[in-house]
């Protein structure tokens, strides 16, 4: 490793170390007492969460010291690499993002929390491009399509008969075939300390101990949490110089969640109920941005057919870190927002004949705006291509053909097609 590479590696390692104590989801989640109190009141009273509630649960790190360290790293990146160095620009942005994340966590229970969340993850009112529909529009459009599917009544959900233990065993077996059984690369285990049905770490997937699953759920988790989230983390950990690619600031969350949803679709692992879950989150965030409170969002989920406990869980995702009458935590916009952005990126890469760019989405916790730079860094030997790639991205033939058709279909008018097909459909 030459001096230039060593400089990048040392600065990169400092970013990885500095972000270690930051645990966003742990810092914003509501504890079991809040859930029990709300359900005991039959969902009629606001959860007892305010600024004082978060003050009673202080951050597990010295926020001032962490912000200062990122400030120092950002200054040292400029001092040692200059203002326009491509790797330096990525690392400086990461430092700024992490400082903003810490400020958001310091603002738990205040109006600033929701405002900073919008800066980091976006808002439901954001348009994809000038003149295009917003995320909120996308949520409503998808809901309409899903309602048409639901109205048929013949696409039934499989009953959830698999326990967490059975889901763990199935996932472990499948992922061992992908990542290597002998190496024990990925561990899958039960956990009672998570809000979602599953969550991925660096080399593990946690399954909520009291959750029930069906075979479709397990397949989606295999693709979403395993092939994408754990896969990109392992590829990031495999980077010899740009070690920062093993960690994901908010800008990479949008790209990574979008990539995971896209993988579900092209692996035929998604299904209407799964998509409904994502659209409901987007619609709920839009409701809160329009002024809805916790009880109104809770009722929205009840109207969607969820039981009281699940409706509480869904609503609390939207308000975690905030208060029951405050602005939402907008991280859950990442799924649909990221899907559209990543899909468009791959479409354009195929149109322009730049297929070599696409697999680099998996070389770590990548961010779309960095993709051209990452291609350059691979050519310079500063970034290594991904070791673990889903088969759909190892062989780009099928995906390329799909995107060629997709590029053409974008030019057709669905309204015109609907009118012309009215006599045959």
What are these regions (language model features)?
Residues 198-204, 231-237, 309-315:
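Active-site-adjacent bridging/hinge elements
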Residues 274-425:
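Conserved alpha-helical "signature site"
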Residues 52, 56, 61, 216, ...:
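Post-HEXXH active-site segment of zinc metalloproteases
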Residues 81-213:
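Contiguous, non-catalytic segments that form substrate-binding/exosite surfaces or channel walls
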Residues 218-231:
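Short alpha-helix carrying the canonical HExxH Zn2+-binding catalytic motif
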Residues 1-134, 403, 408-425:
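N-terminal low-structure segments adjacent to metalloprotease catalytic domains
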Residues 173-184, 230-238, 263-273, 348-351:
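Secondary-structure boundary elements
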Residues 246-286, 338:
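Post-HExxH zinc-binding segment in Zn-dependent metallohydrolases
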């Amino acid at each position: 490793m030459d001096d230039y590479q060593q400089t990048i590696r040392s600065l990169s390692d400092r970013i990885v170390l500095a972000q270690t104590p930051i645990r966003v989801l742990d810092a914003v989640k509501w504890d079991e007492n809040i859930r029990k109190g709300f359900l005991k009141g039959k969902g009629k009273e606001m959860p007892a969460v305010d600024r004082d509630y978060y003050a009673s649960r202080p951050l597990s790190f010295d926020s001032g010291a962490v912000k200062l360290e990122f400030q120092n790293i950002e200054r040292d990146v400029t001092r040692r690499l200059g203002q326009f160095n491509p790797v330096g620009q990525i690392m400086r942005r990461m430092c700024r993002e992490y400082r903003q994340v810490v400020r958001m966590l310091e603002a738990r229970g205040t109006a600033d929390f929701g405002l900073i969340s919008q800066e980091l993850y976006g808002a439901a009112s954001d348009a994809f491009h000038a003149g295009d529909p917003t995320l909120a529009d996308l949520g409503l459009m998808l809901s309409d399509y899903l309602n048409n599917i639901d109205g048929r009544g013949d696409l039934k959900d499989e009953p959830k008969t698999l326990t967490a233990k059975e889901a763990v065993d199935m996932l472990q077996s499948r992922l061992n075939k992908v990542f290597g059984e002998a190496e024990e690369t990925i561990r899958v285990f039960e956990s009672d300390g998570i809000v979602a049905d599953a969550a991925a770490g660096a080399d593990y997937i946690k399954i909520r101990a009291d959750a029930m699953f069906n075979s479709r759920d397990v397949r989606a988790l295999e693709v979403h949490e395993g092939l994408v989230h754990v896969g990109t983390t392992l590829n990031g950990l495999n980077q010899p110089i740009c070690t920062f690619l093993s960690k994901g600031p908010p800008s990479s969350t949008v790209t990574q969640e979008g990539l995971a949803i896209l993988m579900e679709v092209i692996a035929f692992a998604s299904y209407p109920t799964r998509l409904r879950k994502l659209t409901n989150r987007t619609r709920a965030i839009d409701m809160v941005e329009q002024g809805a409170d916790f009880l109104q969002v809770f009722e929205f989920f009840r109207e969607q057919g969820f039981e009281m406990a699940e409706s509480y869980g869904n609503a609390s995702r939207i308000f975690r870190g905030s208060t029951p009458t405050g602005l939402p935590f907008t991280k859950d916009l990442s799924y649909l927002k990221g899907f559209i952005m990543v899909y468009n990126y791959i479409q354009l890469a195929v149109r322009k004949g730049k297929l070599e760019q696409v697999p680099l989405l998996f070389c770590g916790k990548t961010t779309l705006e960095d993709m051209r730079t990452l291609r350059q860094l691979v050519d310079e030997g500063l970034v290594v291509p991904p070791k673990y790639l889903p088969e759909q991205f190892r062989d780009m033939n099928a995906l390329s053909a799909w995107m060629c058709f997709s590029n053409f279909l974008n030019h057709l008018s669905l309204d015109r097609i609907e009118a012309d097909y009215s006599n045959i459909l």
